């Protein structure tokens, strides 16, 4: 059985026992988190939501919060002596999907 959930402006296809990385959630590590915005549930009886599936929940265990690898943003204008270097690290939350209920 799988589900499609919406979090952080993105959609994820998740299975029970899967580890996923999502945008940072404001919850403590080692706690459980429930996703209420379930767009679809697949398996033997597939269900599509309009826009969400009623009474469907995906439960996940919060493993840790971390930051991604640094990326460099470099702006440059030729012949104008303009250079701007900036770094960015995106925060994320690592989750373990424990249960999908319809």
Curated annotation (Swiss-Prot):
It comes from the Bacteria. Keywords: Ribonucleoprotein, Ribosomal protein, RNA-binding, rRNA-binding. GO terms for biological process: translation. One of its GO terms (molecular function) is rRNA binding. GO terms for cellular component: cytoplasm; ribonucleoprotein complex; ribosome. SUPFAM superfamilies: L21p-like. Belongs to the bacterial ribosomal protein bL21 family. This protein binds to 23S rRNA in the presence of protein L20. HAMAP family: Ribosomal_bL21 (MF_01363). Part of the 50S ribosomal subunit. Contacts protein L20. This is Large ribosomal subunit protein bL21. The gene is rplU.
């Amino acid at each position: 059985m799988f589900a499609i959930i919406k979090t952080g402006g993105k959609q994820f296809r998740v299975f029970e026992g899967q580890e996923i990385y999502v945008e940072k959630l404001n919850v403590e590590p080692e706690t459980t988190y429930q996703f209420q915005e379930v767009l679809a549930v697949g398996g033997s009886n597939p269900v599509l939501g309009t826009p969400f599936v009623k009474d469907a929940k995906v439960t996940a265990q919060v493993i840790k919060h971390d930051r991604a690898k640094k990326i460099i943003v470099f702006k440059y204008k030729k012949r104008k002596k303009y250079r701007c270097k900036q770094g960015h690290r995106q925060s994320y939350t690592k989750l373990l999907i424990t249960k999908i209920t319809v």
